[in-house]
Amino acid sequence: MKRLTFGACICCLLSLMACSQKAKQVQIPEYDKGINIIPLPMQLTESDDSFEVDDKTTICVSAEELKPIAKLLADKLRASADLSLQIEIGEEPSGNAIYIGVDTALPLKEEGYMLRSDKRGVSIIGKSAHGAFYGMQTLLQLLPAEVESSNEVLLPMTVPGVEIKDEPAFGYRGFMLDVCRHFLSVEDIKKHIDIMAMFKINRFHWHLTEDQAWRIEIKKYPRLTEVGSTRTEGDGTQYSGFYTQEQVRDIVQYASDRFITVIPEIEMPGHAMAALAAYPQLACFPREFKPRIIWGVEQDVYCAGKDSVFRFISDVIDEVAPLFPGTYFHIGGDECPKDRWKACSLCQKRMRDNGLKDEHELQSYFIKQAEKVLQKHGKRLIGWDEILEGGLAPSATVMSWRGEDGGIAAANMNHDVIMTPGSGGLYLDHYQGDPTVEPVAIGGYAPLEQVYAYNPLPKELPADKHRYVLGAQANLWAEYLYTSERYDYQAYPRLLAVAELTWTPLAKKDFADFCRRLDNACVRLDMHGINYHIPLPEQPGGSSDFIAFTDKAKLTFTTSRPMKMVYTLDETEPTLTSTPYTVPLEFAQTGLLKIRTVTAGGKMSPVRRIRVEKQPFNMSMEVPAPKPGLTIRTAYGDLYDVPDLQQVASWEVGTVSSLEEIMHGKEKITSPEVLERRVVEATGYVLIPEDGVYEFSTENNEFWIDNVKLIDNVGEVKKFSRRNSSRALQKGYHPIKTIWVGAIQGGWPTYWNYSRVMIRLKGEEKFKPISSDMLFQ
């Protein structure tokens, strides 16, 4: 049975209302009141007038080229309001019409427009067709959010009276999707393009090749997709997918119809393992390669000393460039280790022959060769800020991701720059809430407010260099985006903040008002089936779903942006009518708290289930003649998680002095071929220094104390601990057990963790490792 999305449910409900209550007065939802445009226009004046679109309204355009814009508008109104508006070409009508025209003499930027609405109708005049399109998108946002519904709704399509003069602060407003670590279907890509267009994002940066996969068909090199698009994951399953050139053309045209330029990225000279798996001879030291199944940076890269590599690069560009009519072509250029080049006689010869003093200059040489091929196709090169190292290609545009320094340096060299620093909140794969309650992510912390606050013009950049900052871009890397819904969750609503910071004048930005307008925008996202992030209730200082206490417990909750929370204490699921959370909750007895967040549109977050348990101090044990350390037993074989331990036939027994020794310390794993699959179970005692309630945290598979399984990470991608738990403990020795399984789970090798267990006494701010002087056997 297929799961209905929240948006689909809303549409069905509104459709039923439309059928059964046509003649009844409908109350306008709070989120539809007021002006809710994102991004906020440069100038907006309200009036008391309004205009209602009805079945006699016409859409008039000044030229044939504007008819596709009118059709997009008409299609929306037909689906949501059952209005079949006629599209005509001609002068602006006197009344009951929506007029869309172009005036190249408008004193605005190319994408600017003017919009006027009053009781006679709506007039949209763009500086260009781009501007007319964005004016149409603004009109849609002046209408109720339900205009985005694919089913008829019972709401008047009323446009408030306004005069708008608008243009973007920046010409480049971008969104990058990584489809290599994980894959998105053509329909999923189009869904994101629809949302980008709605909020005036005009560049789609498509990351198509990586160590983990090659995702675009190259007819001259069929093995790039035959071999390079499929990898065998750590659990033995296969993951694959690629786009045919015909599908690429379809997506590019779909984007173009919505005034979005698609920029392809073909990574070079690093992040090339999928290509090397298909054609090993492109490496410095050919061997049998496979697409990388762990994240991070691969040491094997394209050989810069082989002429055949540059012929390959030229051939690939020759096929890819014609598929993308836009000006820019992204060649990556980031995170390219130089170890193989240093050891390669051909690379060293290339350096000597061309007077290159080091491998950084060799990378610059590589990039410049690619630039020459791109210029043949009339393309301009974009690269990540590493392309600055060793000398910048003459016409290169720099995408500054490692902070702003690269962008500042490039702008000071009179090179165009696109700002996209993770430190500025523009890496949407970063956490947007407490990592202990959010789905696993790559790390970092970029809540909505931080994203919104970013200014693409660094204070350190002289004013006369501002013109080189083309704009900013949000990047969505996909290491931990295991489903298309997870792409949605990480991207929205933060991408809307990026839309506003790149369009709206800095002086007009207002986060509180943005959040108000976001209530309306989220309903629009519902209509498109977007699984956007709803802030979860969080506990300051670190969230936990199991709270032990000895006397009383007080639980305080916040959200990463202001949201209503509701809860229950009777084990029922919280609903819209459940008790609102307004003050900290106090517990004197054991109980189960269920709490969730509610949006203005009535959508609810997942439920947090928090067990609050009153405990006596669990008694310590007498341990005769305790010795330092822990007893361990180790098994080797095809083991993936704790349930696999049942098949272990033999164990090796030993001892360790610390928890970190369980896995020999944090291991540097650069390739899955060197992984030694094993499981380690450690048992012994922990010496608790004083009576108290202690909270524990670990990335190990399991942690037990007093023969109680306190933390169970089975099934989790164990990059960060998400199952912290507490227990009331008496001073003295308590039996413990922890299990660590060495495996690759969701692309993350557990060998990259520390096998330690963290502890903190209630009231302490920070965790600390259980140290060796606390461990006994």
Swiss-Prot record:
It holds the Pfam family Glyco_hydro_20b. Keywords: Cell outer membrane, Glycosidase, Hydrolase, Lipoprotein, Membrane, Palmitate, Signal. It is an enzyme of class 3 (hydrolase). It is found in: Cell outer membrane. Residues 625-766 form the PA14 domain. Its main location: membrane. GO terms for molecular function: beta-N-acetylhexosaminidase activity. Its EC number is 3.2.1.52. SUPFAM superfamilies: (Trans)glycosidases, beta-N-acetylhexosaminidase-like domain. It comes from the Bacteria. A lipid is attached at C19 (N-palmitoyl cysteine). GO terms for cellular component: cell outer membrane. Residues 1-18 form the signal peptide. A lipid is attached at C19 (S-diacylglycerol cysteine). It is a lipid-anchor. It catalyses: Hydrolysis of terminal non-reducing N-acetyl-D-hexosamine residues in N-acetyl-beta-D-hexosaminides. GO terms for biological process: carbohydrate metabolic process; glycosaminoglycan metabolic process. Belongs to the glycosyl hydrolase 20 family. This is Beta-hexosaminidase.
